[in-house]
Amino acid sequence: MKLTPMMQQYLEVKEKCKDCILFFRLGDFYEMFFEDAETASKELELVLTGRDCGLSKRAPMCGIPYHSASNYINRLVSKGYKIAICEQLEDPSAAKGIVKRDIVKIVTPGTYSDSNFLNETKNNYIMSLYIEDKSVAMCFCDISTGDFFATSHSLDKSIILDEISKFDPSELLLNKDIDKNILKEIKNRFTISITNLEKDYFKDYNLLEGQFSDFSKEEYSLVLIKCGNGLLKYILETQKMSLGHIDCFKNYNIVDYLSMDINSRRNLEITETIRDKSRKGSLLWVLDKCSTAMGARLIRNWVEQPLINKEKIDKRLNAVEELVLNISLHEDLKDALKDIYDIQRIVGKISSKNVNAKELLSLKNSIEKLPYIKDILSKLEADLFKDMLSNLDELKDIYELLESSIMDNPPITIKDGNLIKNGFNKEIDELRMAKSHGKEWIANLESSEREFTGIKSLKVGYNKVFGYFIEVTKSNISSVPEGRYVRKQTLSNCERYITPELKEMEDKILGAEEKLISLEYEVFVSIRNSIEKDIDRMKISANIVAILDCLSSLSTVALENNYSKPKILEGNDIIIKDGRHPVVEKMIPTGSFVANDTTMDTEDNQMLLITGPNMAGKSTYMRQVALITIMAQIGSFVPAKEASISLCDKIFTRIGASDDLSAGKSTFMVEMWEVSNILKNATSKSLIILDEVGRGTSTFDGLSIAWAVIEYICNNKNLRSKTLFATHYHELIQLENKIKGVKNYSVSVKEMDKDIVFLRKIIEGGADQSYGIEVAKLAGLPEDVIIRAKEILNSIEQNKDNKIELDDIKENKNHIEKENKKEIATDKLLANDDFQISFTQIEEENLIKEISSIDILNLNPMEGFNKLYDLINKAKSIEKK
């Protein structure tokens, strides 16, 4: 048997898009066949039917109306599918043989640009990742706005994960021969649509130079050029058109921004909460009070990429301060901003020929506000505002064109007429007049025929099948004069008639209407094309509006929450007076948050060692220091009475327990990997947050590791990062007298009767107990358990031999010099004879030989910890024997 011609055509088109669901246009429907139909019927909950295709079995089929396709496309794209749109390329009534059809667009998660369904507060990025010769390049594009930027770096898996985490792309393009471990890590950590491409796909095709007038290959590495070319090629192939709004190539350097690895972003809840991935409860939720979608997207970018350039930060802070101090001007600015639509995405639609008349009307109404904004800018003095004033284009010519041409309430579709105002085009006015006169003639005909026949219910109607007709109900048919009308249609309750004069007028009316709709569409396209020439001007003004909106948002937040302007320093100090957690204070009753001071530097206050019970507020305090630092480097006021913040290059956090079972890693192993990453990558300009390091293993192992980490951070002159270290190992408080830079702090607790009250105040000095049983009581453990726990604790405390004293653990002086050469100390830890970590009890020659043979010059921090852990376990095993 042979396939039908239509089905042959379908399979030929399908061959071009094997990885897509093909929407095949047949009349007023998009039809899907075979496997595509089965998939779509399941995902879209459509009825699966069949169609004769020339084979013995009917082809599985389902379909959707073409006019409602957007909703179905969105549902499929959100589930990670790609959709190929195949349209009819000629009028079926004029076609000779089978209608010509072909793919006009491929919609993928990363190239989806329908603003009706996109999150207006977040960019929809597609990302390409290209690795070659121990270098990696990453390129990002948001088709809806035209943003296109890239970076390159020496190959580092953590850098790749950090950038994916930062920009959260919907789709990732990568070369098929990418390292399997990197690919596995990406799949484990992110929900992202991945498209594998042959390495040749990324070859240098000179596409970037063709797309971006300011791009020069000589300025960039080959790996970056290939990465960018691959992304641009994919975009052009899927969109099937030139995209003029993608006209600016930006190369960014990762080290130009405050770096936060994937764990830090998660732990600090920068854009979403850990618990339920909600925006509410994140730092972004606090800072985003933007009036426009453009501002909301930009402030998200600011939050994801805090600055490390003092001049740029101070410019933002000075602008925010001026708005805070000029409340009247600030309110005027907010009033103007709230009426501005998403100019960036409207411009994207203009470029891709998808804009409708309502969106052009929104563009006009937005442009109308630009003179007001320019007037406000002229009254402001901050350098950032002066820069904006000189660059803001009021776009008056575009406003005048749209004001004179587009109807005030046009339809959504652009092929149904009623788009163009009277007076803009003479021919349109004449056709409207003809159409109007024709309909007036119809109305007069209805009136005269009622009078002539005496049938008061007689009416002149219209439908697309029969055109105009005279309708008479069954009860009045006897009153119709003989020979006056020609019967056209009989219905159950009426008869429909025509006359030669009515048909003649119908031709005139419909002819005028058809010409009018066609001409209005032509004029609309002409207006759109005229505006498209000024895309650059519109993008510049839109970007200025977005920046203004961000500054306005930060000013609003500062005023609403009683924030202060931080002082940005070049040194290493962090000094915060009455600091507060920006998120927590908004989630509890106003005024109930307990503020705390912070003093940190790289000398006497480098390592703040914080002890105290669970639930007392240690983690909140440490996070607030990190968040205040981030806010300051964004250019935001901060939740504190005063704050002086030295520029920070990186923020690291190691907070909470997290298994990575899919990778076969335990909680403790994950913890050690994270600590290792911190020690390898932190610098003297970094801020480190460490919460309960070492708790994932036995007490003495954990204590040993925590102690070694503190020594390493404080004694390594190439590190010496400012660090907040929370611990339950109270023995560590004695390190304040042993290691320069360690400073003890604790969370104050008040004992009342037999209960405790957390005062949430950070005070100098270490805590001497954890109040663990009291916390357990607060958590609701049974009374019997609490009583028994106290009995056991009393018994343990009475046995003094079971209490470890850190003074008994001799600090090894020799390793400090070695650590300044990036080594890990694995020298013997000497302790009380009653404990398992006592190396003096180890007499077996083979273990001694193993220890003496360790080449510490070639151990990194992680290997050092692992080796120490292994030696301790062997020592325990020998002791048991």
UniProtKB/Swiss-Prot annotation:
Pfam families: MutS_I, MutS_II, MutS_III, MutS_IV, MutS_V
Keyword presence, DNA damage: yes
CDD domains membership: ABC_MutS1
Gene3D superfamilies for the chain: 1.10.1420.10, DNA repair protein MutS, domain I, MutS, connector domain, P-loop containing nucleotide triphosphate hydrolases
Annotated InterPro entries: DNA_mismatch_repair_MutS (IPR005748), DNA_mismatch_repair_MutS-lik_N (IPR007695), DNA_mismatch_repair_MutS/MSH (IPR017261), DNA_mismatch_repair_MutS_C (IPR000432), DNA_mismatch_repair_MutS_clamp (IPR007861), DNA_mismatch_repair_MutS_core (IPR007696), DNA_mismatch_repair_MutS_N (IPR016151), DNA_mismatch_repair_MutS_sf (IPR036187)
Record GO cellular component, one term: cytosol
Superkingdom as given in the UniProt entry: Bacteria
GO molecular function list: ATP binding; ATP-dependent DNA damage sensor activity; damaged DNA binding; mismatched DNA binding
Keywords: ATP-binding, DNA damage, DNA repair, DNA-binding, Nucleotide-binding
The keyword Transmembrane helix is annotated on this UniProt entry: no
GO biological process entries: mismatch repair
PROSITE patterns tied to this protein: DNA_MISMATCH_REPAIR_2 (PS00486)
UniProt binding sites for ATP: G612, P613, N614, M615, A616, G617, K618, S619
Family: Belongs to the DNA mismatch repair MutS family.
Entry function: This protein is involved in the repair of mismatches in DNA. It is possible that it carries out the mismatch recognition step. This protein has a weak ATPase activity.
Name of the protein described by the UniProt record: DNA mismatch repair protein MutS
Gene: mutS
